[in-house]
């Protein structure tokens, strides 16, 4: 029966925080390049194996004291001009390769100015290989017999490795060998003589304590960082002679272990030093180098050669690789050849060389900044962010400084005096880098399998030569005594020999008997054990059959449950879809309901607003019609009273004519008396029934007029002679030709018992301004009429028959301005003699910005229907102003009215200003407030023309 393979114990997890307190500083080494000429001036001197001294060469600026400045810098070890590549490798790179084989990461990079020997240190020269070929040689010397077959390990795109079994690896090898031009071949090929001398290393170097129970695989990759872009030097791009494609840059990614790697980078599996260096040399030919003023082959990019060592333990039998991905250990050694920092004033770089130098210096400056921040965070406990992402170089090696691994730096310097300033900056950077500490890498975890399993099934020699057990037993017998017989008479040697042989024979026979006895006992025991095993096997087989039947039944039950589960899942899916449809319908209905509710609320609000508006309009209309009715009733009453008064006066005049005796014809007065005589006309009754307290007196004690005084009824006040007033009104006697001296106006009528009260009404006084005791002679017919109301206020009433004269505004100065004549299309052409004529005017039917921008004045012709049925034309004038926004605004300043009247219309007589008295506290209801307050006297601030007549009546609101 085949023994069951034991399960591999789980790999113990190692916490990263377990060794976080153990840190090692960055190892910085210094290598001094030999001078090109023996008599060349030198600025660097090696003091001992750890210290160099940098002194100012002749011709440079001295310090403040006038002396040359000498500075010493310490390193972990200093390599002079006579140091060989072997010595440098043993001290710097050998520990890194040893850690690589034991599953630890490492970083080695060279730093210095251009032409300081960095590439020579890393690559070497014919006959003297550098660090890179020596590292490869040491790796393959250590794992040469433990390497896995090709394609057992296969890289993926996630910075990890996959394991293939022997069969899959064999198929992969056959597939690659069947290709017309395989990239790698397992057959031995002749080494390229171009680099054959570089990899011929005479000194044999091998790592110690290599795990023999593991298999190893080596993968190499080669990239360069050019102008802060990453390019794969091993990428095979098909050559197109017509349109060659430029190399594509690669991107940086972070794997699950937070390690940075180049996505899509080519990793080649190598099996020997020659094959690995051949891959390196193929990529080295693609690297960008150029001839500068300081170096014939100057590196224009940073190159990174990665050596990835993959190891996996053997299974418990020691025959095949353990097919568990968790047991794979991947370690990486990065060999970096940094481009040299340079100054453009020395290299005289132009064009692309200048751009390359700028990018190189920028990346090196970023590396120095990262070191400064790391040093400050570690020394002072700060937590500043390290700017790794500012450069692809620092971002690629971020996990070495923040994670685990050993970091080594070789500072290459050229001791010639011309490189003094550059070497000074390099030394300062090296001094800062030595103070940066990196976490110590952890040891590789033990897999837990039995050591030495590789040689478990390997034969130790030929099968036919194996010694028997009896021979082994015989070898344990005591040695025979000496058998040399020197004397013929020797009788002791042979008896001793015979006795020893007999003892050995007896002992051998006894041991054979014991062996046979033990063998028979072991056979019996083995037979019993076989019987017991057989019985147990039969018992286990019966149980196994029962278990298999049970398992088959459970499988059937599982299949039934799976079918039921699928049916239920299908029903659940249908229900979920139905629920989704219902929920969607519900959401749509809810949205529609919300929309309808909002619409209903808006309608309700509009309805309430409309109801309130209608209520207000009804109330306003009701109040308006009530006022209008009251006003019309009052006007009708007043009209009737006036008619009664006129009839009463006519009756009185007729009565006076009838009753008066006939007298002689009066003598015609002279002109002088006519001038001094105050001619009065009959005053029409006031449109309102005035209070009986209103009287008019003549100032300075003058006598009343000679006309006979007539009295109204008992309910009215005394008045002047009605006959003279009527005759004067009928004869149209102008009253403004007679001067009138007015001293005062009685605000209240004095009621005295037994004295007849007479209301002396003088002709209406017209004038712009008057004073007490001064004669005022009106000069214009349209001057303001001044009256007194029952409250003692002065009323200024214009003469309605006077010609219209604009008193408020000055004469228009539009003669020199350009006008916009706005005549709407709805206006009608009037046949008046006086027509508005504006020269150089722009006539428009609709006001526009273009016309307003060209003119300074604006005139709008507006027509409306007057109260008498005639068309009234208003010319509304204004000034045009420019606004800040670039437009125009119009400020209206004046209105001119053009109106036609019929000359046959009867002139309405004015009512008398004297009205019957009303009780105290009673208010006048003859008209509304709007009509009473429509006329006022207004004087603007700063005006020198005196008060002016202004009409403030608002137009009646039309019915909606």
From Swiss-Prot:
Name the principal localization, coarsely classed.
Answer: nucleus
Record's protein name? Kinesin-like protein KIF23
User: Where Phosphothreonine occurs, residue numbers?
Assistant: 738, 927
Instruction: From the record heading the sequence, give the disease linked to this protein.
Output: Anemia, congenital dyserythropoietic, 3A: An autosomal dominant blood disorder characterized by ineffective erythropoiesis, hemolytic anemia, macrocytosis in the peripheral blood, intravascular hemolysis, and giant multinucleated erythroblasts in the bone marrow.
Compositional bias (Basic and acidic residues): 661-679
| Record-listed ATP binding positions | 112-119
Q: Where is this cross-link: Glycyl lysine isopeptide (Lys-Gly) (interchain with G-Cter in SUMO2)?
A: 571, 586, 624, 647, 662, 665, 741, 823, 854, 874, 877, 899, 956
Q: Where is this region: Interaction with ARF6?
A: 794-911
Instruction: Point out the gene that encodes the protein.
Output: KIF23
Which is one Pfam family of this protein?
Kinesin
Report the residue ranges where the short sequence motif Nuclear localization signal is annotated in this entry.
7-11
Q: Which UniProt keywords apply?
A: ATP-binding, Cell cycle, Cell division, Coiled coil, Congenital dyserythropoietic anemia, Cytoplasm, Cytoskeleton, Disease variant, Hereditary hemolytic anemia, Isopeptide bond, Microtubule, Mitosis, Motor protein, Nucleotide-binding, Nucleus, Phosphoprotein, Ubl conjugation
- Where Phosphoserine occurs, the residues are 155, 160, 605, 682, 684, 814, 867, 902, 911
